[in-house]
C-alpha cells in the first residue's frame, strides 16, 4: 500500500491534496520504493507502476502536469491547453480536475489554496527558487487576496540538517535582512531553516495562514528520499487540485 501524507490544514470543500513518501512502491534500491521521478536513473517501468499506485491511493482525478523543474521562479498556469514549455517550478490552476504537482527530495514543496476553494497551486522551492521569489510569484497568480490564501509546507530537509555556505545566507539577507534569524553558525558554515525562510517570505506578501513545516527528509530515512543524504535516490511528489 502506497503511504501518503494528507496535509493537516483547514482545506475548503472542493480542494484535495496529498504528498507521497518513499513507501509502497516497486522500485529497487537506491530508489526504493515509491520513486515517482523518471529523470533520476530508475527503471521506467517501475516508475510508471509507482505512479499508477500513487494516483489510485490519492484518488487523483487526472494525471498530474509534471513540470521541468529548474530551481527558478516561473509559474505555469494550467489551462488544459498544450504547453509550449513546462520549464517552471510552480503551477497554478483554477480548473477542477487539473492536478498541480511538484517533485522533491529535500527541496521544499509548498501547496496553496484560497479559502473559497476556487484556486490552487503547487511550488518546488529549493533555496535558489525560494531566494529568487518563487513563492511570491505564485501568490501573485491568485485572483484572491493574500490574506485569503492558505499555504502548507511539505516535507523538506530540516533545520538541523541543511548545512549551507555563507553565500546562501548573504543571498537571502540581500533580499530581507530578517532572514538572518533563519541561519545558525555551524563551524565555517551555517544551518539554514528553509521552513522559517518560507514563512518569512509568505508573511512579507500577506500570507499568514501557514501550516506544516515539521518534517525532515534528511533524518527520516525510512519515510523520505533525500538527495543530500543519498545522492542517487528517488523523488517524492506533492499534489493539489480542485475537485
From Swiss-Prot:
Q: Which domain of life is it from?
A: Bacteria
User: Where does the signal sequence lie?
Assistant: none
Q: Which GO terms describe its molecular function?
A: adenosine deaminase activity; copper ion binding; oxidoreductase activity; S-methyl-5-thioadenosine phosphorylase activity
Which reaction(s) does its UniProt entry say it catalyses?
adenosine + phosphate = alpha-D-ribose 1-phosphate + adenine; S-methyl-5'-thioadenosine + phosphate = 5-(methylsulfanyl)-alpha-D-ribose 1-phosphate + adenine; inosine + phosphate = alpha-D-ribose 1-phosphate + hypoxanthine; adenosine + H2O + H(+) = inosine + NH4(+)
The UniProt keyword set, sorted, is: Copper, Hydrolase, Metal-binding, Oxidoreductase, Transferase, Zinc
Q: Which InterPro entries match?
A: Cu_polyphenol_OxRdtase, Cu_polyphenol_OxRdtase_sf, Cytotoxic_necrot_fac-like_cat
Tell me the SUPFAM superfamilies matching this sequence: CNF1/YfiH-like putative cysteine hydrolases
- Can you name the source organism? Shigella flexneri
Required co-factor(s) are:
Zn(2+)
Pfam families the record matches: Cu-oxidase_4
**Protein purpose:** Purine nucleoside enzyme that catalyzes the phosphorolysis of adenosine and inosine nucleosides, yielding D-ribose 1-phosphate and the respective free bases, adenine and hypoxanthine. Also catalyzes the phosphorolysis of S-methyl-5'-thioadenosine into adenine and S-methyl-5-thio-alpha-D-ribose 1-phosphate. Also has adenosine deaminase activity.
Instruction: Please state what the protein is called.
Output: Purine nucleoside phosphorylase YfiH
The question of whether Oxidoreductase is a record keyword is answered with yes
Q: Which residues form a coiled coil?
A: none
Q: What family classification does the UniProt entry report for this protein? A: Belongs to the purine nucleoside phosphorylase YfiH/LACC1 family.
| Encoding gene, per UniProt annotation | yfiH
CDD domains reported for this sequence: YfiH (cd16833)
Amino acid at each position: 500500500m502506497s503511504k501518503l501524507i494528507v496535509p493537516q490544514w483547514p482545506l475548503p470543500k472542493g480542494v484535495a491534496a496529498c504528498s507521497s513518501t518513499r513507501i509502497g512502491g516497486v522500485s529497487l534500491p537506491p530508489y526504493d520504493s515509491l520513486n515517482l521521478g523518471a529523470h533520476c536513473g530508475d527503471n521506467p517501468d517501475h516508475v510508471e507502476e509507482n505512479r499508477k499506485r500513487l494516483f489510485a491511493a490519492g484518488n487523483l482525478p487526472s494525471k498530474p502536469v509534471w513540470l521541468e523543474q529548474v530551481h527558478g521562479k516561473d509559474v505555469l498556469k494550467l489551462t488544459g491547453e498544450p504547453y509550449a514549455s513546462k520549464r517552471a517550478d510552480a503551477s497554478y490552476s483554477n480548473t477542477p480536475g487539473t492536478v498541480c504537482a511538484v517533485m522533491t527530495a529535500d527541496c521544499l514543496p509548498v501547496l496553496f489554496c484560497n479559502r473559497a476553494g476556487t484556486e490552487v497551486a503547487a511550488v518546488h522551492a529549493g533555496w535558489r527558487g525560494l531566494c529568487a521569489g518563487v513563492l511570491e510569484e505564485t501568490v501573485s497568480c491568485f485572483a484572491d487576496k493574500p490574506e485569503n490564501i492558505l499555504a502548507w509546507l511539505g516535507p523538506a530537509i530540516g533545520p538541523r540538517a541543511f548545512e549551507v555556505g555563507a553565500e546562501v545566507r548573504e543571498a537571502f539577507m540581500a533580499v530581507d535582512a530578517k532572514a538572518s534569524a533563519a541561519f545558525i553558525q555551524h563551524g565555517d558554515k551555517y544551518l539554514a531553516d528553509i521552513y522559517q525562510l518560507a514563512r518569512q517570505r509568505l508573511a512579507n506578501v500577506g500570507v499568514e495562514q501557514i501550516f506544516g513545516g515539521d518534517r525532515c527528509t534528511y533524518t527520516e530515512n525510512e519515510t523520505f528520499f533525500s538527495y543530500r543524504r543519498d545522492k542517487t535516490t528517488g523523488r517524492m511528489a506533492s499534489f493539489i487540485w480542485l475537485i
